[in-house]
């Protein structure tokens, strides 16, 4: 009986020694969602198959639903100024042929090092809702 208990204790010790060593060896990965990265201008421009007015409203709704702070809106000019943390962006909507419009989201300070998920979240929201009726 004592021999079985000792064997189980040794086995228990070996298993926990291996698990703790394995946990130390695993590298820790940084969350890259909100890490600033250099973004190309091509990633900031996207064409949608909706008209100017609908894309403008979808952009405003996307910014609002992502809890970004809207600082200025001009519907006639087709632009929205919004901020996320310390980053400030200009979202501009352009007409591009019949039934098409372009959305361009650029940083206001013209420094293209920011978390790319900020603009990706806006584009993703618009893509998911562009065919819904208002």
Model-derived features: where do they sit?
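Bacterial N-terminal signal peptides that target proteins for export
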Residues: 1-9
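Short, intrinsically disordered, low-complexity terminal segments
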Residues: 2, 18-21
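Bacterial N-terminal signal peptides
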Residues: 8-18
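Ser/Thr-rich, low-complexity intrinsically disordered terminal regions
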Residues: 22-134
